[in-house]
Amino acid sequence: LNIISADGTENKVSDKRAANTEDENSSSENSKEAYDAAIYGDADINLSGNGKLTVEGGYEDGIHSKSNLSVESGNYSVTASHHGLNGKTTLVVKNGTFDVTTVEDALHSKGDVTVENGEININAGDDAVHADNTLNVKDGTINVAASNEGLEGITVNIEGGDITVNSSDDGVNAAGDTEDGSQASYAINISGGNLKVVPGGDGIDSNGDLNISGGNIFIDGPSDGGNAPVDYD
């Protein structure tokens, strides 16, 4: 599924269904709903163009691909009662401008999330950017005004970019469960970029390794005295 927002246009896709309040979201095998997002696809979804696309995910997600979700360019405003942009296998942001407001995660994948460039502004009720596997930030600007945890994955790689995270819990977190329940090798690797974290919990928290070889890091907190600016095993 290729969605191109033509230059100079303003487009809107809205899911008017009431928010799903059940514990299991509608993409589960037992769900009676065929789809759970304003824009939904069983196959890959590719977004591009220089126009504006507003997406309102009233029921659950704003945009959800059961395969790979990729954004090449464009201007996006996404609100959702669950996740904002959800690529089950992978989520890749190559470029674009985003304003994402969600009850759950703003950017989410059961696989890998990669941010190559772009400007992403996030207000999230849960994680700002969450990968069940690996989260890569290569460049771009990520501004997280509010989140539970900011950047989370089993492995978090920050190679560049300008990142500001406000979180009620951990700012950058290497944690989570593997799909088969086995013990994961957690790691946070920071080799470049500018990272500012204003956390309620730990600023940087790895349940495994922490490797810092470059970049600029500023941690203002935590506000909760039971936590630490940096915590790793």
Question: What is the meaning of each model-derived region?
Answer:
Residues 1-233:
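A composition-driven surface/loop motif
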